[in-house]
A protein has these predicted regions:
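A fold-wide structural signal in alpha/beta-hydrolase
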Residues: 1-7, 41, 65
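Residue-level signal for short, function-critical loop segments
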Residues: 9, 46, 119
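Gly/Ser-rich "nucleophile elbow"/oxyanion-hole loop immediately N-terminal to the catalytic nucleophile
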Residues: 12-47, 52, 57-63, 107
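Short, solvent-exposed loop/turn and secondary-structure capping segments
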Residues: 14-19, 53-55, 66-68, 76-82, ...
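Short beta-strand immediately N-terminal to the catalytic nucleophile in serine-hydrolase-like folds
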Residues: 42-44, 69, 116
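C-terminal catalytic histidine-bearing segment of alpha/beta-hydrolase fold enzymes
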Residues: 122, 126-152
């Protein structure tokens, strides 16, 4: 077993340089170790869970399964729910939606998902995972979901 824990260059939601760090770490591991490409799994918690959603939906061909834990999945959904109508310019909203795991959920049709979230999470609200799991189930994706009491 080979385990990678790329940092993703800090707090960038695993986009841009953070996404590249993860992809380059996987490529380097494949180059240096005899890895079965059908047994590469992606997981992470909180910011890492956000990265797991993001990277798995953009690169589903790389993973046998994904297990996001307390991951954030869609910025506009969150801001609309918390603050009402978004004040972002239309181009910004459409840009973020084009890269949002929530709007790319269909790309996980062939990638089993095992999602976990704490019911009392105050950083990434539990409705983030609930919404994604509902969407995945509507799309008939393979998804298991567990909410953990007293976990925040």
């Amino acid at each position: 077993m080979v385990e990678l824990q790329p940092f993703g260059r800090g707090n960038n939601w695993y986009r841009g340089l953070g996404e590249n760090d993860v992809l380059q770490a996987i490529a380097a591991a494949k180059q240096h170790y005899s890895l079965d490409p059908d047994r590469i799994y992606l997981t992470g918690g909180s910011m890492g869970g956000t990265g797991a959603w993001h990277i798995a939906t953009l690169h589903p061909e790389l993973f046998a399964a994904v297990a996001p834990v307390c991951g954030h999945l869609e910025y506009a959904y969150d801001s609309d729910r918390e603050f009402g109508d978004s004040t972002e310019p239309a181009w910004s909203r459409s840009f973020w939606q084009s890269r949002s795991p929530y709007f790319l959920a269909a790309d996980l049709l062939n990638v089993p998902v095992n999602c976990h979230h704490g019911k009392d999470d105050t950083i990434v609200p539990v409705y983030q995972s609930q919404a994604m799991v509902r969407k995945l189930r509507e799309l008939k994706c393979s998804v298991d979901y567990e909410e953990h009491s007293y976990v925040g």
